[in-house]
Amino acid sequence: MPTINQLVRKGREKKVVKSKSPALNKGYNSFKKEQTNVSSPQKRGVCTRVGTMTPKKPNSALRKYARVRLTNGIEVTAYIPGIGHNLQEHSVVLIRGGRVKDLPGVRYHIIRGALDAAGVANRMQGRSKYGAKKPKAAKK
């Protein structure tokens, strides 16, 4: 434990908090052509590649992902949630933070039902998370 004199000479160091979704903390000034420190909850981007990858060790599947170039110039890998999707190269998507635990390097999710990403078809529960509209009541 330090003495009071040691603390006066050299105080406690603050912990540096590292962001879990750093691409959302950068903006882009197109006039100055430089990045800015403007954070946002979501960002828009264009898909440069859409594909599947296999998860880490205990799991087995083909998880869908898209490589997205954001409006701030950063290119990230984002997960496409839900069953089936309509995304292809040059699709405009909205991404949010949130990693996929069994896919290394995937720190973002694509928001379904926004911009070019269609909602999940025939989804009844948890619809708001997948951009699915409320189904019409069946006529008697």
From Swiss-Prot:
GO terms for biological process: translation. Residues 33-55 are annotated as: Disordered. Transmembrane segments: none annotated. With S4 and S5 plays an important role in translational accuracy. Interacts with and stabilizes bases of the 16S rRNA that are involved in tRNA selection in the A site and with the mRNA backbone. Located at the interface of the 30S and 50S subunits, it traverses the body of the 30S subunit contacting proteins on the other side and probably holding the rRNA structure together. The combined cluster of proteins S8, S12 and S17 appears to hold together the shoulder and platform of the 30S subunit. PANTHER family: 30S RIBOSOMAL PROTEIN S12 FAMILY MEMBER. Part of the 30S ribosomal subunit. Contacts proteins S8 and S17. May interact with IF1 in the 30S initiation complex. This is Small ribosomal subunit protein uS12. The lineage of its organism: Bacteria, Bacillati, Bacillota, Bacilli, Bacillales.
